[in-house]
């Protein structure tokens, strides 16, 4: 027996353990196969799919572990060690993906204000083509797993939206995504634990953030089972620029 967590977002979540700053330390650890990954690979879909494309990784050695999501593997490894059970990660993340691609049709239909906001404010700033289409990766990577029971959700996404001045989509949308995915992977009544990493705002010009709602939006009321980890990389900024100031992005209770 064991438990499975769903990992989602963009390239931050895809970033492999081999590229992590602590890779050398993790290479020395014992990798016993108690951490297992399913990694989604597809280009999205305009319509909901029944089957998911991907591949399996069982971390029986460093050679396998280093190919896994750094965040996902570290989380699963430590959780497995604490609970004494195998832990699986379904990594659905896609580099460069926008938030609106991860929401399902039923959710946008039930929340027309959010759908109207995406149509009016988000889609006009999207790249040409279908990569940024509403529901795109939900259709191909989340919908096929409906009914599968998961223990919780790991989330790391936001750069693509912030870079295009759409930070408010996160404030508006994350509570909807938590309920959406909790319906897919939970019991249909209770919200799953939702663990999210805030993006490091020092990477973006101030005018990307001003007026977006990104800097003030989420709190414990909006996401009752949510836990938002601030990632400002202060030590790294200090090394690069000589000084840094850490300011919370979200006001989390």
Task: Give short role names for the model-derived ranges.
Residues 1-253:
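Cell-envelope and extracellular/periplasmic
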């Amino acid at each position: 027996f064991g438990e499975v967590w769903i990992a989602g977002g963009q390239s931050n979540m895809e970033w492999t353990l081999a590229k992590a700053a602590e890779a050398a330390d993790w290479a020395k650890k014992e990798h016993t196969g108690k951490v297992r990954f399913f990694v989604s690979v597809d280009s999205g879909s305009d319509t909901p799919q029944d089957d998911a494309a991907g591949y399996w990784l069982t971390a029986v050695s460093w050679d396998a572990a280093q190919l896994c999501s750094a965040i996902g593997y570290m989380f699963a490894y430590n959780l497995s060690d604490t609970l004494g059970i195998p832990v699986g990660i379904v990594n659905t993340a896609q580099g460069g993906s926008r938030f609106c691609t991860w929401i399902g049709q039923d959710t946008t239909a039930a929340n027309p204000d959010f759908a109207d906001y995406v149509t009016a404010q988000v889609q006009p700033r999207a790249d040409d083509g279908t990569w940024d289409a509403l529901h795109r990766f939900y259709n191909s990577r989340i919908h096929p797993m409906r009914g599968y029971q998961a223990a919780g959700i790991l989330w790391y996404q936001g750069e693509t939206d912030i870079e295009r001045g759409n930070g408010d989509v996160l404030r508006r949308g994350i509570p909807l995504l938590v309920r959406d995915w909790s319906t897919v992977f939970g019991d249909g009544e209770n919200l799953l634990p939702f663990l999210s990493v805030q993006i490091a705002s020092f990477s973006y010009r101030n005018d990307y953030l001003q007026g977006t709602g990104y800097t003030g939006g989420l709190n414990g009321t909006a996401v009752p089972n949510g836990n938002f980890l601030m990632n400002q990389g202060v030590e790294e900024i200090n090394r690069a620029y000589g000084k840094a100031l850490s300011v919370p992005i979200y006001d989390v209770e």
